[in-house]
C-alpha cells in the first residue's frame, strides 16, 4: 500500500491523472515480482529461513534481549534453540511498558518501531505488540501486493477498473510522546488514504470513523450506490456476511436514501460527519430504480451479482472458525461468478503465510517474514519435539513458534495449523483453531470446528438461515452438557425449538462422539439450545467497539469461556421460544 501511495504522489507531481485501473495495474505488477521472489525462496526454503534468523540475531545483538542471550555468539539454529526459551506475551510485557512509558528503545528490537498494535483478544485490555518498519514492509510485499497479483491472474481484466467495498475501520490512537497505537489494518488504510476515493466505494468517514458513526450504513449505502463494484474486501468473512445481511434487511431505507440523496435521520452520526457525507451525495433516481427492481423480487436467489453485475471477488479470512460465513455468503448472497480469495495466516504478531492461488485455503509460509519452528499439537508442551520447516510432516497438526523483526523470539502463537502439502520446500499450511478454543464438559476436547460443523449441518438440514452461534460448556449442571445459543435470520414456519435442539444434539454427537458415550454412561446430558433475539451478534460487535476494541479485531464468540460472554448471550435469549 505504501508503494501505491508513493506512486500516487509521484504521478500527482508529474500532473498525471490517476485512475483505479492505473493503481491496480501497478500493484498487480509489483505483486507479480513479490510472488516470483517467494517461489524462488521455495526452492531452498530452509536455507533462506536460517539466513533470515542469523541476520536477525546479528542486527539485534546489541538490544537488551540480544545482550541477555548473547546473540552475537549464536552461529547455528541449534545454539539458538538451546540458549533461548520458548516464550509467551508475559515475557515481553515489561519491555513494552518501558518502551511506551519511559521512552526506552533498543530493548526488544533494534529496528525502528512504526506503531504499537493491539492483538485481537476477546475482552479486557488487548496485548500490545511493537510493529517495526521491517515487518510492515514484509506485510506489504508478501500480503497486500501478492494478493493483487493473484487477482490479476484469476479475475477478468475489468477488475482493475472497478472499485472495492472496503469493510475495514481504521482506529489509531496517539499515546505518550507521539507514539501511535492501533491495529495493522489501520496502518495500511492510513498509508493508502490518498488513493482510497479512487479504488474504494467506502467513504473516509466509515474507514476512519469518529467513534459515533454508523459505519454499516455508510458501507452499505455507498456500496449500493456504486454500479462499478468489483470486490468486497474485509478482514474476516464474518463482516462480509454481516453487511450483506444488513442490506437485505434495510434495503428499503438504503434505496430511498440513494434515490433522494439523503441520509436517514435515524442513522447515528455526528452533525459534522452528516454534513461531510451530505456533501458527497446527490439524488440517484436511476440507480435507485435498478436496485428496487432487484430487491422487490425477493431474496430466494442471490442478489449480490444482480445489484453489482461486475462483482467478481470477496476476500478475507475464511478458514477455521470463519468457514461458516463463506458457506452463508455462497448459499444466500452470491452465485458461481464470484470467487473467493482466502487470506493466509496473518496477525498483529506477524505474517505467517500467503495463498499462492485464488480460492485456495492452503497458504505458503514466507521464509523472509519470520523464523519458523513447529511444535506438534499432540506433544503436550514437550519442547524437545519442536522441528524446523524442513522436518514437518504433511497431514500433521502443529503450533507455530515464531521469531520475527518485531522483537518476539521463540514466541508461542497458540494457533493450531495443519501441514496440507508442500510447494517445493515450502510447507503449505491451513489454520485449524485456536488452541485455547477447545471445550470440555468432561474430557472430550471438542474443537471449535466440531461446533461449527454442527451448526452448519443443522441449518442445512432444517432450512434455517443461521446468522451465528455460540456454545457454552455447562459443567455446573447436574449432568454436564453443551448449551448452544443460535441466532437465525429466517426459520421455516411451524418449526419448534425442540426440533432444532434434537438435530443439533445428533450432529454434535457425530462430530464429538465422546458426548454420546457420556450420556450412555449417565455422566453427561443432552445438548441444550437457546434461540437469540434478532441482531444479537451485531449488538455484540457494537458493544466491543464501544468498549474500545478496534472494529477490525472483533472476532465471533463461538466458544464461551468467560462469565461476561455467558451473561451477555443469556440476557438476549428470545423468550417466546422458551415457552
Residue map of PLM features:
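Contiguous, well-ordered alpha-helical segments that form the cores/surfaces of helical PPI scaffolds
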Residues: 114-118, 349-352
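Short secondary-structure capping/junction motifs at helix and strand boundaries
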Residues: 127-130, 151-163, 253-257, 338-339
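Conserved nucleotide-state-sensing and coupling region of NTP-binding domains
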Residues: 159-175
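Alpha-helical scaffold segments in carbohydrate-active enzymes
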Residues: 142-149, 242, 350
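Active-site diphosphate/adenylate-binding microenvironment
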Residues: 51-55, 59-116, 128, 134, ...
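Long, hydrophobic, well-ordered secondary-structure blocks that form the structural core
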Residues: 130, 135-142, 340, 346-348
Amino acid at each position: 500500500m505504501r508503494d501505491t501511495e508513493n506512486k500516487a504522489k509521484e504521478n500527482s507531481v508529474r500532473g498525471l491523472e490517476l485512475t483505479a485501473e492505473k493503481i491496480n495495474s501497478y500493484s498487480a505488477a509489483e505483486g507479480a515480482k513479490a510472488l516470483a521472489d517467494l517461489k524462488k525462496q521455495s526452492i531452498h526454503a530452509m536455507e533462506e529461513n536460517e539466513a533470515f534468523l542469523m541476520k536477525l540475531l546479528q542486527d539485534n545483538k546489541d538490544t537488551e534481549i540480544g545482550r541477555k542471550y548473547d546473540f552475537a555468539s549464536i552461529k547455528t539454529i541449534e545454539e539458538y534453540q538451546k540458549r533461548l526459551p520458548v516464550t509467551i506475551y508475559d515475557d515481553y510485557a515489561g519491555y513494552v511498558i518501558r518502551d511506551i512509558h519511559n521512552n526506552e528503545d533498543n530493548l526488544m528490537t533494534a529496528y525502528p518501531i512504526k506503531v504499537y498494535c493491539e492483538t485481537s483478544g476477546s475482552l479486557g485490555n488487548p496485548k500490545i505488540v511493537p510493529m517495526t518498519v521491517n515487518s510492515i514492509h514484509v506485510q506489504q510485499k508478501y500480503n497486500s501486493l501478492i494478493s493483487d497479483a493473484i487477482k490479476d491472474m484469476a479475475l477478468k481484466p475489468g477488475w482493475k477498473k472497478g472499485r472495492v467495498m472496503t469493510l475495514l475501520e481504521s482506529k489509531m490512537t496517539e499515546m505518550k510522546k507521539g507514539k501511535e497505537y492501533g491495529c495493522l489494518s489501520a496502518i495500511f488504510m492510513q498509508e493508502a488514504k490518498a488513493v482510497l476515493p479512487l479504488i474504494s466505494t467506502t467513504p473516509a468517514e466509515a474507514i476512519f470513523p469518529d467513534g459515533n458513526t454508523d459505519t454499516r450504513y455508510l458501507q452499505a449505502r455507498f456500496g449500493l450506490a456504486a454500479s462499478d463494484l468489483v470486490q468486497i474486501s474485509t478482514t474476516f468473512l464474518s463482516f462480509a456476511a454481516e453487511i450483506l445481511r444488513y442490506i437485505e434487511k434495510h434495503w428499503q431505507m438504503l434505496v430511498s436514501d440513494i434515490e433522494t440523496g439523503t441520509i436517514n435521520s435515524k442513522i447515528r452520526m455526528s452533525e459534522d460527519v452528516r454534513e461531510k457525507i451530505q456533501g458527497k451525495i446527490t439524488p440517484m433516481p436511476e440507480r435507485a430504480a435498478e436496485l428496487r427492481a432487484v430487491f422487490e423480487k425477493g431474496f430466494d436467489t442471490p442478489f449480490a451479482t444482480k445489484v453489482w453485475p461486475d462483482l467478481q471477488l470477496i476476500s478475507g479470512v475464511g478458514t477455521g472458525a470463519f468457514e461458516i460465513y463463506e458457506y452463508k455468503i455462497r448459499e444466500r448472497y452470491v452465485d458461481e461468478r464470484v470467487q473467493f480469495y482466502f487470506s493466509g495466516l496473518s496477525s498483529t504478531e506477524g505474517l505467517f503465510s500467503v495463498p499462492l492461488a485464488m480460492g485456495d485455503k492452503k497458504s505458503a509460509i514466507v521464509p523472509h517474514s519470520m523464523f519458523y519452528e513447529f511444535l506438534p499439537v499432540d506433544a503436550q508442551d514437550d519442547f524437545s519435539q519442536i522441528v524446523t520447516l524442513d522436518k514437518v510432516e504433511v497431514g500433521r497438526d502443529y503450533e507455530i513458534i515464531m521469531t520475527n523483526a518485531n522483537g518476539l523470539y521463540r514466541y508461542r502463537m497458540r494457533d493450531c495449523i495443519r501441514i496440507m502439502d508442500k510447494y517445493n520446500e515450502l510447507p503449505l499450511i491451513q489454520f485449524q483453531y485456536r488452541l485455547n478454543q477447545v471445550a470440555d464438559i468432561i474430557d472430550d476436547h471438542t474443537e471449535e470446528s466440531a461446533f461449527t460443523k454442527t451448526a452448519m449441518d443443522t441449518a442445512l438440514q432444517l432450512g434455517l438461515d443461521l446468522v451465528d452461534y455460540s456454545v457454552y460448556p455447562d459443567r455446573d449442571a447436574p449432568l454436564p452438557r453443551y448449551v448452544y445459543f443460535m441466532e437465525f435470520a429466517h426459520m421455516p414456519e411451524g418449526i419448534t425449538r425442540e426440533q432444532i435442539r434434537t438435530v443439533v444434539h445428533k450432529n454434535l454427537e457425530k462430530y464429538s462422539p465422546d458426548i454420546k458415550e457420556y450420556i450412555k454412561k449417565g455422566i453427561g446430558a443432552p445438548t441444550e439450545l437457546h434461540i437469540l433475539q434478532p441482531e444479537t451478534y451485531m449488538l455484540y460487535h457494537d458493544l466491543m467497539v464501544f468498549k474500545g476494541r478496534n472494529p477490525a479485531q472483533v472476532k465471533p464468540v463461538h466458544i464461551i469461556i468467560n462469565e461476561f460472554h455467558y451473561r451477555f448471550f443469556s440476557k438476549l435469549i428470545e423468550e417466546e421460544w422458551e415457552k
